């Protein structure tokens, strides 16, 4: 991931409404939600939400599919995982024992973090790279 893409993602998520909508859609996984359900869950007017969903979709953070007269939104989870990989790719400068101590107090699931091993600072050696997972799943920002 390029620094500019990460910066754009953080700028978009600096809006409370966008952050809430994105987290809700991450929670829903591949099922996603239609816009009206999102508006109801977040207790905001659909017209207000529409603006935020459009911004997230245009940036590639959400995908949208038409279902009759409804639009179903889904979080681009591979992009989220790519961001986590970008943030952690040089964690603890290759000293996994430091990462282990820090992870023990973190609420982040080990399932989304790179394995603690001698490859800690070398994501290209992870069993399955996030680039392979997200290949063609999110547009360039």
Model-flagged regions — what are they?
Residues 60-63, 68-69, 84-86:
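Short, Lys/Arg-enriched C-terminal cap helix and immediately downstream tail that follows
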Residues 40, 57-58:
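Alpha-helical residues within the helix-turn-helix
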Residues 1-5, 26-27, 77-141:
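Amphipathic alpha-helical dimerization/coiled-coil segments
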Residues 34-35, 65, 96, 100:
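Short, hydrophobic secondary-structure boundary micro-motifs
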Residues 49, 56, 73:
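Divalent metal-coordination and catalytic microenvironments
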Residues 45-46, 52:
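Short coil turns linking two alpha-helices in DNA-binding domains
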Residues 4-45, 67-79:
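N-terminal helix-turn-helix DNA-binding core of bacterial DNA-binding proteins
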